[in-house]
């Protein structure tokens, strides 16, 4: 029997919001702040919400308008308190207003008559990457890179099995040591989970740690093994709180009377075959997780390679785009794919395009086509979807851009406005330098185009992505210039933010 291993999962608390608070010399735990690009619209997603603002039941990935509305509701209640305490002021319009507001939780808790305010900080993705790198280097002071798996910009898994006897520490002590050093160096608090496998470490962090008191610095550390997992979490609801258990899976489980992990474990004793009928090979993962098992360790997840490779570009447009303007965006996105393939020396066999329509097409009335429900429960026209396959794998812009535009024309309804576009380069493989040719193929022209792409890529890498642009990128509605200044679809750097009352 293999020796029991010990894993840590560490998550930086409200990471983007915490970075913004620390850079403003504000306490991340008591400052009301959201990270969102208010220059777009109030429909924009909040990338992060500070812990003190989450306390007002504002979710971490709310739309900005949802945060604005919730703050209005809170302030309506607080204003009544201010009026009763004779601390509100009456304006010339005869209405009462707050005499003062604050974005600090301590001040707001001390004086219920204060108005709730908050800071809207524009995202600065490059800054977050820099801080994440700094924190990763802190972990490397204690463990080898071979024993760390960065799960995201703000979350890591660490196999600490061999380090506990070396440092003469328990897993809790080592986790606290690393978390404390991160806090000292960056001002950012973290939550940690300890488990006998990766799955249990993740659940200890995601679920159990949230229900235990934090220390004076806001740090929470929880532990799980297979037995404590069954005792603490077999009756936990909802199932969507569990790692890798999405809403679709939960709906199918509930049809069979399965509402908890305990239900699933008991069902699997006699109903294993039925689970495989419903979920296929994914049933194995569900059953293992129901019992608290996870066979994959650090070596397995680091060596994993997907069976097929693809490269994708996607964006949600800031407003509804008419069909002709949306086609311009598709051409720009295909060009970005071209440069990504060229840089990685890859070619693709086909392009898949998915176009999501705006809900205004339904709201205005008159639309009678197929519909679907978006993630917010709203009715929208059914998305357009299509694929174009090439005669031979390619990364040439003349093919990718023109064929993507033709595909867009073929699959979309020109009468509908567009809000979301995703384009995928499928089955990418190394570029061997070969062309599919016939008597009419001008191979010199193809080679010239490839060299031009490589030259343009070199200029972009040296002088910036906007150093070489097509004239179409200066047309109204084009987004290439803006997106070239972004990281992950969000601003790489921004202003200091605005105070909202």
Regions found by a protein language model. Give the residues of each.
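Gly/Gly-Pro- and Ser/Thr-rich, intrinsically disordered tail segments characteristic of DNA damage-repair
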Residues: 1-288, 295-298, 443-501
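Core structural elements
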Residues: 153-156, 347-362, 424-432
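Short conserved micro-motifs at the rims of enzyme active sites and ligand-binding pockets
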Residues: 363-367, 433-437, 481
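C-terminal hydrophobic structural anchor segments
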Residues: 405-461
